[in-house]
C-alpha cells in the first residue's frame, strides 16, 4: 500500500480505515461498489467497497464447487489436492482479477493508459524495493509505451521447458498443474485489458466450466499466451525470482 503509484483498491468495508492509514494521500471512497466516480489526475487512491457476494465471479461459486467435488473432476485433474481444486472461492477471486481491471478502467480510464493487477500479498516479493521512488520508473513507462496496446505477463523460463518452448498448447493443458506464467502481477495498455478479460472469460466459461473443469488463472494465461501471441508481450524470467517483473518495471 505504500508503493508510490495510483491505485484502485477493491476491499470490504472493514478494511477502509486500514487502507486510509497506509496510503496517506487523496482518497476517493466509493461506498456502493458501483461503476462511475470522479477520478482526476491529482487523485492517488480510489477505494471500491464490495461485499463478498459482489466479487465479480461470485455468482459462479456454487457451480464451480459442484465441479470440484465431483469424482470425475478429481480423476481428470492433475494434483487435485491443490487449494484451487478444492475451494471454489479461490478460483472466484483469481478470475475476478480480470473483471476488477475492467472496473478500474471505468473509474480512471480517461486519466491512465496502463493498468496492472498486483496481488494484495505481493509486497513480500518486493525484495527491498525503495518505496520512496515513484513507480513505475520513467524508463519502464517508455518501455510500456513501446509495447503498444499489448498485455504484459511474466513467463518463467527455467523449469518447464516443454511448455515455454511450445508453439501452441492443447486444451489438455487446462488439466495440468504446471504453471509457468506469473499470476501475482500482470497488465498493460487499457485496450489490452478489455481483450484479455474477454478471452479469459470465454476460456473459463466455455473451455473449463462447460467441460466440468476449473483450473487456476496461471494455467489459463499459460494456454492463452500461446493461442493469442499477438495480444501478449512476454517478460522472460531467467533468475528464479517469483515476481521479477515488478523489479524490472521499477
PLM-predicted stretches and their roles:
Residues 1-6, 22-27:
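Short, acidic, metal-binding catalytic loop of nucleotide-sugar glycosyltransferases
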Residues 9-11:
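Short beta-strand/turn micro-motifs composed of small residues
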Residues 13-20, 161-163:
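Short, charged/polar "capping" segments at the starts of alpha-helices
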Residues 21-23, 62, 129-131, 198-200:
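Short coil/turn segments at secondary-structure boundaries
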Residues 25-109:
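Active-site-proximal specificity loops/subdomain of glycosyltransferases
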Residues 89, 93-152:
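GT-A fold catalytic core of metal-dependent nucleotide-sugar glycosyltransferases
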Residues 122-128, 149-151, 158, 167-250:
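Catalytic core and acceptor-binding pocket of nucleotide-sugar-dependent glycosyltransferases
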